[in-house]
């Protein structure tokens, strides 16, 4: 029986590996979950369509989830621009208990200023980054490591050290992306289900 609901944007390059990703999440978390995805083009995950996508999540996707899993914690996550979108989503709505922002594109112009004024509403915040991602001379990508470090310090101040995590992985932005996503989602599953099990009647109802 699932103990948690995962929500993520699904870009075309992720589709063929989705089942593998889910298997890795199950292996890493050791707990049941259900995943809801919505298909997007990666370029839609910042600026122009994000408001429309958020409206779809809040008005349509969440309603479908609550019809079956209203008592389960909700986690939103993504990779690259999807990771940035997931983190941004939690600054606009409090519906998600946790966020897994894996190798998020925090180098986007204006992000730090935006987040300073609009902190995340999630209870648990996970970020990850490849150790080589900042080892480049290309702007703005070379800034991503320091931006992630500053972002993590904000998370510590907002939710506390036990409620946030910054994981450094081997490799660059394209190394083991499915495993990185799995570890992020698994951390969120573990945190949001730490005091619940499938027979616990005290879990929240939205």
List PLM regions with ranges:
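Intrinsic disorder/low-complexity segments
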Residues: 191-206
